[in-house]
Curated annotation (Swiss-Prot):
InterPro entries: DNA/RNA_pol_sf (IPR043502), DNA_pol_Y-fam_lit_finger_sf (IPR036775), DNA_polymerase-Y (IPR050116), DNApol_IV (IPR022880), PolY_HhH_motif (IPR024728), Rev_trsase/Diguanyl_cyclase (IPR043128), UmuC (IPR001126). GO terms for cellular component: cytoplasm. PANTHER family: DNA POLYMERASE KAPPA, DNA REPAIR POLYMERASE UMUC / TRANSFERASE FAMILY MEMBER. This is DNA polymerase IV. The lineage of its organism: Archaea, Thermoproteota, Thermoprotei, Sulfolobales, Sulfolobaceae.
């Protein structure tokens, strides 16, 4: 298998630069304003000039303005970015047989049948980058690998406007020696848990396989072990984004369940209003007072109805509050694996 991972570099900010060339060379910060106060909210993304100042995604806007006094702060224009994303994804799809859209600015592409080897894949990736730049003026980074995760990792290492490749014979050593923080899906909390027991490189999980499930759960343990043993081969699946979410800013930072539940209920109602089908997964997502993100989820064989969603979400919220002592700033739900119910009997089961 030969997979490309395409990452639209600092996407929202880059689109703003394309639409307004006078922004080029200036620190540009695209923000999500919460509406509490004039500068309440968080940074969605920033260009590399802003990042050099220390401004990064998730940072409170008020702090970003203290750091970047001369930076240009812009509100997020999601509809504009979605239009550009659709056009770019259409270009990318022409270079492979299966396109898996991971997010508004990331995609996996299976090119196994389009090229005879990895050197030819590199040439194809160059052509893809050139066409996107010519038609949309957008710079993207491409990673090439024998599976999705390796392709993503090498892309992350070659930003911005880069092209990275890992050949099959290099994968085993590359993954074994990879710093655990570089593994997709390993966040700050998981990283801390793993480092405490001496897991600093991905290869270290092999010697800790017996205790790994207790540390990070069965699903993540299996994922990490399959990567470390070079047996990860999840295919690229032809699909667009199959989740819907809605997040609400709380009136004030709090841990009080009674103050959080009305906002959680509202986010459920709005998320379900956008769904055309039955979600098989539900996640509660909490943005903490320091803008760290914590989530808990649950899967259902036959889906979860809106009527049932609130009780499930409350259960997941309780788990977050029990495991984390910080106050919540925002709360919401994400509905995943949205599908059509085969029969009414299945859905009501």
């Amino acid at each position: 298998m030969i997979v490309l991972f395409v990452d639209f570099d600092y996407f929202f900010a880059q689109v703003e630069e394309i639409l307004n060339p006078s922004l080029k060379g200036k620190p540009v910060v695209v923000c999500v304003y919460s509406g509490r106060t004039k500068d309440s909210g968080a940074v969605a993304t920033s260009n590399y000039e802003a990042r050099k100042l220390g401004i990064k995604a998730g940072m409170p806007i008020i702090k970003a303005k203290e750091i970047g006094k001369d930076a240009v702060f812009l509100p997020m224009r999601k509809e504009v970015y979605q239009q550009v994303s659709r056009r770019v994804m259409n270009i990318i799809s022409g270079y492979g047989d299966k396109l898996e859209i991971a997010s508004i600015d990331e995609a996996y592409l299976d090119i196994t049948r389009r090229v005879k080897d990895f050197d030819e894949a590199k040439e194809l990736a160059r052509k893809l980058k050139a066409e996107v730049l010519e038609k949309e003026r957008l710079r993207v980074t491409v990673g090439i690998g024998p599976n999705k995760v390796v392709a993503k990792i090498i892309a992350d290492m070659n930003k911005p406007d880069g092209l990275g490749i890992i050949y099959p014979e290099e994968v085993k050593d590359f993954l074994y020696n990879l710093d655990i923080s570089k593994v997709p899906g390993v966040g700050k909390i998981t990283e801390e848990i793993l480092r405490k027991v001496g897991i600093n490189r991905l290869g270290d999980v092999i010697n800790k396989s017996g205790e790994l499930v207790n540390l990070v759960g069965k699903s993540k343990a299996n994922y990490l072990l399959s990567l470390a043993n070079n047996t990860y081969h999840d295919p690229v699946e032809s699909r667009e984004i199959t989740h819907r979410g809605r997040y609400v800013t709380l009136p004030e930072n709090t841990r009080d369940l009674n103050r959080i539940l009305p906002s959680l209920k509202r986010s459920i109602e709005e998320a379900y209003s956008k769904v055309d089908g039955i979600p098989m997964e539900i996640y509660v997502v909490a943005i903490m007072e320091d803008l760290d993100i914590v989530s808990k989820g649950k899967s259902f064989k036959f889906g979860v109805s809106q009527d049932r969603a609130l009780s499930v979400a409350q259960e997941l919220l309780n788990k977050i509050l029990e495991s984390d002592k910080r106050k919540l700033r925002r709360v919401g739900v994400r509905l995943g694996k949205i599908t059509k119910s085969s029969t009414l009997e299945d859905f009501l089961h």
